[in-house]
Amino acid sequence: MYLSPEQVALVGQVFESFVLEHHQKEIAQILTEKYEDAHYSLVVNAMTLFEANMEIGEYFNAFPNEVLPIFDNALRRAAMSFLQSCSEKQTLVMKQNFHARITGLPVCPELTREHIPRTRDVGHFLSVTGTVIRTSLVKVLEYEQDFMCNKCKHVVTVKADFEQYYTFKPPITCSNEEGCNSSKFTCLSDSSTPASCRDYQEIKIQEQVQRLSVGSIPRSMIVVLEDDLVDSCKSGDDVTVYGVVMQRWKPLYIDTRCDLEIVLKANYIAVNNEQPCGVVINEEVRKEYEGFWEKYRNSPLEGRNEILASLCPQVFGMFVVKLAVAMVLAGGVQRIDSAGTRVRGESHLLLVGDPGTGKSQFLKYAVKITPRSVLTAGIGSTSAGLTVTAVKDSGEWNLEAGALVLADGGLCCIDEFNSIKEHDRTSIHEAMEQQTISVAKAGLVCKLNTRTTILAATNPKGQYDPEESISVNVALASPLLSRFDLVLVLLDTKNEDWDRIISSFILESKGCPRKSDKLWSMEKMKTYFCLIKNLQPKMSQDANVILVRYYQLQRQSSCRNAARTTIRLLESLIRLAEAHARLMYRDVVTTEDAITVVSIMESSMQGGALLGGVNALHTSFPENPREQYRMQCELLLERLGLQKLLDKELQRLDRQQNEDSLESDHGESASNISCNLVGHKVHSDSAMEETCSTNETFSSPDATRKTIPDILDMTKSDDTISKGTITPAEQNRAIRTQSKSSSKHNTQSLAGGHLSENHLTRCSDKSLGWFDSLQSVQMSPISKLGEGCTAEKLQPAVLPVLAEGSCHPDKEVVDLVGNKSEVLQKSGSSPVGTERHLSNRIVTEHVSKKWQNLNKNSLCGKTGSNMTSLQSENSGSHTVCSSGPLHSTPGAPWKRKKIIAQVEKETKAELLDPDTQARLVQLARFSFKQHSKLVHLPGGKTDIASIAQNHEDQPDQKLTPSDRLNKLDRILNNVDKASNSVKGLKQQDTLAQENPPKQTVLAQQSNSISNAATACVHEKKLNEGSDSRKVSSSTLAKLARFSFSPPPENKALEASKETLISSRAAAPSSKRKCFQLEPSSDKTTMSSKFLFSTDLDDDELDVDWEVEIKRNKRTAT
């Protein structure tokens, strides 16, 4: 079916009037061009045309091949009418080759396709989106030929048949009106004019991979370009082709199958590289991002971290990796030096890590948010697949683009990078540095652009060895590694906290996934990274000084990599600094950008001259970015020797912090006023002081320390603790979230069992935000003290105060289960406000009952006086400055006075007990010697001297040195009085030592027992003796078996022993590493195998002591 002449006239008239009304300026511009024979296009929007006349739309969709020539003729007539109506005819020249290019089809499945058309689409005008994978050479196409009749000399014009590959079919008979029926013609192609020829090119487009369904292989099809559409695109471009789907076949032969293929004859082609698909950047979008950075004007690092948290949110933590990926995606500024050489602005990143560390997740996310990107794996990539391939098609060689060429101007992600073969891997050296690929294949010599960012991931070769170089671990050559700006190592080392947090994060996201309001969507991230690509930041003088000094330090480092510490390192630093400035939405590279880049480079395997390599896997988001940056400034600038820049930067940080605090105070006051207007009750200043506390410590010496209202002075906090406002789980969670540095988000902490509103919200949330400060500050939570803790248990647990400089944030601070605990903080006087509360700075240590029983008298005697003196001294103090850890232990209540008096009575009665005196005598027989081979027992300091030392170290007891000596003399007098009651026991010991049984002699010959073993046995004897006054025969026999044959008694030796005991009792500050029972001889023998024999059993030691005495007497006689 064809259009009738009336329909053809209607279509021509309507289109001519439409063009004169809507595209008059474009026609005037075309007429001003100089070349008359060139081809000119006029782009017409189909939606606007169809709205003007729907009948034309129906004709166009039904007969596109017939309507398009009508549009061209109507456009030529419109240009002629415009030229005639124009007053300035001198500057306008009429053109013969006008083409109407239709674009902007309605978005519907009938007209818009993302997949390759099929047979049913033949003859329809469609728009197809794809990627150009191959372009052929531009050819000259003869589309018309003239044939002359040999009889009547009539000339017949024949057009080439598109469906038969533009072949010409000569006329069968002469079409002369005079009635010549000749069938013989002569071709006049030799005398054909250039007007009968046109440019011709074929390209191949492929379906976009991201638009395919699961398991689909991308298909491709040929697109025919003519006239001015030739060379409008290149390999790797994302294009949208508007054209007519047609079919063509080669000439038919007998007994051969027809080779039919579907092609797209293009009417218009739009390249989508300049405007990324799905991204719209307008003034409204710019204002949205400018408002975001205005919100974080005083704390821009927090705004940056919010963007980083939205980058690959399915991966927990990994702060350094996310920052590096974001900087690589932002990219640097490309520039041309004075010699005309182009210096690349794109950065390259290599992720080296164990399997399962999330490398591929970052690659997949980066491909999604980058408009022009290619994702490939090294295991199936060759040199031709990565660069360019020469393909022979239709008798000629063509170049087909590889992954790097397809990613020109975008991102190329290569997974399993070390799986690429060695000779294929060297082919990308030029693509990474010069960003071009030189090709000389099959007679084709050309150079293609590869201005792409390479993000690669690889596994180490075997197990990663930190002692070896990165080149040995990943089996990559140094020239290739030096082209990567950053090489981050992700080692999956043993870390229980990290494993627990990761498992909780994965299970939480699988069970009940929820989206956070702060996280940016993928479309917003995609738009932001497209927007910041337009920024051109300039280097500042301070940033130049820092980067140059760091480069010089890397060059001077003794362990430097000669292949890396070249001028490429300095260029990498500049590119990354510009990328961070883009990420921060700035036009100038500041000191903040330079410091961040140096810290990231130190975490990379390409750096390490200042701090050494860092495992980038176990890095979490900082709780306070400003304080972390302050620490980085102090650490890096001091080592770089830039003190002036350090002072300048610290002043800027203090100024930002002051402005931030002023704004927060203003906001809080405004909220308080609004609460008053509504009718809420506002607490008085005293109530606020009693219920809120600020417990912050800054890491830098220049930071301001804030005072802390002590909990003991808060009388109203008793009710909140007793009512159980906060559960122990919430309190432990709150303690765990506190970090060393302060910020506006955590300025209010625990106070009398209360948390601030913001802090309590974060703690009560089931998310894993409290783990963010795990890497920077590791603290063990302190268990809450029970209310039943008495004063006797709390009083001796006050530990010695260490110096302020001994506090280290990266070590475990407090351990309350069985080990000695030390509070690494410098505290002033510990104020005591009430009788029922202890300071939250006291950490208790659980000791044995024997130690408590021995000290009840001294402790209970001083409790009342000490409490009274402390109350009178510190009743007016309310604040304490602390530089230690930010966690605190809840106070425990005191026992009432009646209970204390009862304990004093029981203690006095127990001291008068002869059994207690006997134990004191046994305790006095201990002697202490240092020995390097003995193991330090954790229960040390159980002698009288250590007890006196503990009493002196307690800050709450106000004892003078004379009082301590008098107390020790009273204890020794009790020992002398009770010595008569154990005189018989000593005689038995001496008798057993002089006459050892046969089994003892055998034990001495086979394996000698150490003094430490004897000490442990004697201590066990003391513990058993606390239940009864008599010593069992089995225990005495056991002691006899482990004794040694004594030499003759020496009185001078006994005198020296007594002198040693008295001197050590008078000097409580002496330090002992181990202790043992006093041997009966001067010579001691150490065991060579075991401290304790494993062959002896308790049944063998169970011997009747009286029978042994009689047996020894018989042998002696």
Swiss-Prot record:
Swiss-Prot/TrEMBL catalytic activity: ATP + H2O = ADP + phosphate + H(+)
Pfam families: MCM (PF00493), MCM_lid (PF17855), MCM_OB (PF17207)
Compartmental location: Nucleus
EC number annotated for this UniProt entry: 3.6.4.12
Gene Ontology cellular component terms for the protein in this record: MCM8-MCM9 complex; nucleus
Chain ranges of the MCM domain: 301-506
Comp. bias regions, Polar residues: 691-702, 722-750, 868-886
Major localisation: nucleus
An example Gene Ontology biological process: regulation of DNA-templated DNA replication initiation
Physiological role: Component of the MCM8-MCM9 complex, a complex involved in homologous recombination repair following DNA interstrand cross-links and plays a key role during gametogenesis. The MCM8-MCM9 complex probably acts as a hexameric helicase required to process aberrant forks into homologous recombination substrates and to orchestrate homologous recombination with resection, fork stabilization and fork restart. In eggs, required for MCM2-7 loading onto chromatin during DNA replication. Probably not required for DNA replication in other cells.
Self-association and partners: Component of the MCM8-MCM9 complex, which forms a hexamer composed of mcm8 and mcm9. Interacts with cdt1.
Protein name listed in UniProt: DNA helicase MCM9
Organism: Xenopus tropicalis
Gene name linked to the record: mcm9
